[in-house]
Amino acid sequence: MIKKIDGTIVDLLFAPLSAGEVIFSISLAAVTRSVVIGIVSIVVFYLIIDIEIKNYLTLIAFTLLSSFVLGCIGIIAGLWAEKFDHMATVTNFVIVPLYFLSGTFYSIERLPDILQAVSKANPFFYMIDGFRYSFIGTSDGSISFGLVYLTALSFVSWFVCYLLYKKGYKIKS
């Protein structure tokens, strides 16, 4: 988004890189940023409270998959948006509702069956459930299904980013 506004998107468009390489690089930059922030957060919280990680492998897997999916969502939003208000629209009407309906603040077992089914279609549910399982050892859903679901969503979201960037959606005149 910022590259579109300040005109530096041209540097990416004229770089001797394929669309796949550019999108993969930007996605991995999002993952790197997320991992660094996560590590710093865990270290700071560890100094304040006693944090026990029950499953390191699950934590790593869900961190990488969640940050990759969210990075791709950010790329899609950045390609679609023409101004910062459009980015706020994505945050306010897509990200925040999915987050609040993900079972972060409550167990989805307390919801009626229909809302449980809706929650289990929400990718944020599996992201948060994976982190919950990593730290406290309990989950509301299937961790293995969550890994498969987020892996598939990673491929799909990356492919959508790839197609939009390759087409030049809202970046090439």
Language-model regions, residue ranges each:
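Transmembrane helix boundary and interhelical loop/hinge segments in multi-pass membrane proteins
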Residues: 1-17, 171
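Hydrophobic alpha-helical segments typical of transmembrane helices
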Residues: 8-9, 27, 39, 72, ...
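Hydrophobic alpha-helical interface/terminus motif in multipass membrane transporters
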Residues: 9-12, 44, 77, 81, ...
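Short coil/turn motifs that cap or connect alpha-helices
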Residues: 18-19, 107
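Alpha-helical transmembrane segments and their short interhelical loops
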Residues: 19-91, 138-162
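Membrane-interfacial helix-loop-helix junctions in multi-pass membrane proteins
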Residues: 49, 99-156
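Hydrophobic transmembrane alpha-helices
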Residues: 64, 80, 90-101, 118-124
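Short cytosolic juxtamembrane segments of multi-pass membrane proteins
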Residues: 165-173
